């Protein structure tokens, strides 16, 4: 029997789940926010961008919270919501795409970690793709593999410590920039329209800034993905909202406070990680060292979180036959051992791509970043569908009308995110998703679920994805679209 009874060691509380959400969202990119946000935008545009993004992501976060309350039977969130709402193939596709996204994302963390180490040990890890960097990055892959194999609860405890250590330098940055904040500097050219430093229209500034905020909340689904290991399913919704609110507040303060101590054109010239550059100007070398240390801790912590999430989705999909049954194997610590080894093994292989072709790797990262977005859309659409059905519980704390409005707005924002990701990337996503079709068909046959997995509706869905992939191959080969 592959599926074992749950052990208390697998149970996670609100604090552990919130730690997963925060560390999943806060990666190394947050330490570059000041420069990234102001490169072509004023303080006013940055403020508007965070407000709009915050509202949009709130609807997605609230969708996850609502679903965890009204459908507590659906574990592993984004996968089971998609399967329940739109059939086994859509569920498989979401799981497959999310899994690939996590694998490539974790290898990116390896690259960023090595590049961050280069600040302390130049030039051995420059660019994150030298031989020493590949060797140490590979070692870290298997160290994280070992930590998660020791049990999800133990790994989440390590993750909480890492999240706290990540937040400390960020909070110090906020306190220091608040100390040096001058409103007279902050309000100078608030909308970026001064002739000597014109940044274009508010619309163009907003567009460039929104593309940065677009990726800041990837990982908000963390608690939902591992909801099957939650001590109380109400903790899943609480952790999602707490993580979202905390990260949004940090993002806003981190982006806006530097406008009160340095002018926009000064901030735009600071090299990444720009938090280090800002503190170097304000307080000296120790501030730069602090931020680079924080960057290193943040990336390692986020890497651990994504390792947990990457192994959990195939495990959950295997439990009901969508992925091969071997992915459901657990070890004595109730960790998804086979899924974890397979994930780490693919990450190890992918590390070679980083060494041999950094350009190809950067392109792949842009593509896989888009692959997580359909999961937000299908989850939101599932709540729309369920809130309009007679199955919606009448005594639910969240009324059906509120759930429908929230999920509809979440769906619209998810569509915007997918559109903003770029058409060329969507076509490449279609190719990667089509690669999973043989595995889906094989799972259906092995589990003797042909009537469910391979009926006309599911075959039609597979055909649409396959045709989209063929169209993408044609357009790329004919140079009609480019990455």
From Swiss-Prot:
Keywords: Amino-acid transport, Antiport, Cell inner membrane, Cell membrane, Membrane, Transmembrane, Transmembrane helix, Transport, Virulence. Catalyzes the exchange of L-arginine for agmatine. The arginine uptake by the bacterium in the macrophage may be a virulence factor against the host innate immune response. Belongs to the amino acid-polyamine-organocation (APC) superfamily. Basic amino acid/polyamine antiporter (APA) (TC 2.A.3.2) family. This is Arginine/agmatine antiporter. PANTHER family: AMINO ACID TRANSPORTER-RELATED, ARGININE_ORNITHINE ANTIPORTER-RELATED. GO terms for cellular component: plasma membrane. It is found in: Cell inner membrane. It comes from Chlamydia trachomatis serovar D (strain ATCC VR-885 / DSM 19411 / UW-3/Cx). Its main location: membrane. GO terms for molecular function: antiporter activity.
């Amino acid at each position: 029997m592959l599926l074992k009874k749950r052990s208390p060691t697998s149970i996670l509380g609100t604090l552990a789940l919130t730690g997963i959400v925060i560390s999943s969202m806060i990666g190394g990119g947050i330490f570059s926010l000041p420069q990234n946000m102001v490169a072509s935008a004023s303080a006013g545009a940055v403020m508007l961008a965070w407000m709009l993004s915050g509202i949009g992501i709130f609807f997605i976060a609230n969708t996850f919270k609502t679903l965890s309350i009204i459908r507590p039977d659906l574990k592993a969130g984004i996968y089971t919501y998609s399967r329940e709402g739109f059939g086994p193939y859509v569920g498989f596709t979401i799981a497959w795409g999310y899994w690939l996204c996590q694998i490539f994302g974790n290898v990116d963390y390896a690259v960023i970690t090595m590049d961050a180490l280069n600040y302390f040990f130049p030039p051995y890890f420059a660019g994150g793709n030298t031989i020493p960097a590949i060797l140490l990055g590979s070692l870290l892959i298997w160290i994280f593999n070992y930590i998660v194999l020791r049990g999800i609860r133990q790994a989440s405890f390590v993750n909480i410590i890492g999240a706290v250590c990540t937040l400390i330098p960020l909070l110090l940055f906020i306190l220091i920039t608040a100390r040096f904040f001058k409103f007279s500097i902050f309000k100078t050219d608030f909308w970026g329209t001064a002739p000597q430093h014109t940044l274009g229209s508010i619309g163009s500034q907003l567009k460039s800034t929104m593309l940065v905020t677009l990726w800041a909340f990837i990982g908000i689904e963390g608690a939902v993905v591992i909801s099957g290991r939650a001590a109380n399913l109400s903790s899943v919704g609480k952790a999602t909202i707490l993580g979202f609110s905390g990260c949004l507040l940090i993002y806003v303060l981190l982006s806006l406070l530097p406008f009160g101590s340095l002018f926009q054109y000064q901030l735009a010239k600071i090299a990444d990680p720009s938090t280090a550059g800002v503190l170097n100007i304000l307080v000296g070398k120790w501030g730069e060292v602090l931020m680079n240390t924080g960057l290193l801790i943040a990336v390692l912590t986020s890497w651990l979180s994504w390792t947990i999430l990457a192994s959990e989705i195939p495990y959950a999909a295997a439990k009901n036959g969508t992925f091969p049954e071997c992915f459901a194997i657990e070890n004595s610590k109730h960790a998804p051992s086979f899924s974890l080894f397979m994930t780490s093994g693919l990450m190890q292989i992918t590390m070679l791509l980083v060494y041999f072709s950094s350009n190809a790797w950067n392109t792949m990262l842009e593509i896989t970043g888009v692959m997580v977005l359909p999961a937000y859309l299908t989850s939101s659409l599932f709540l729309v569908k369920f809130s309009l059905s007679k199955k919606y519980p009448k005594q639910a704390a969240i009324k059906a009308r509120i759930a429908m409005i929230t999920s509809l707005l979440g769906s619209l924002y998810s569509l915007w995110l997918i559109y903003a990701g770029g058409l060329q990337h969507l076509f490449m996503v279609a190719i990667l998703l089509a690669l999973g079709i043989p595995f889906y068909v094989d799972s259906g046959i092995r589990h003797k679920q042909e009537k469910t997995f391979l009926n006309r509706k599911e075959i039609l869905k597979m055909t649409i994805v396959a045709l989209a992939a063929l169209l993408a191959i044609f357009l790329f080969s004919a140079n009609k679209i480019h990455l």
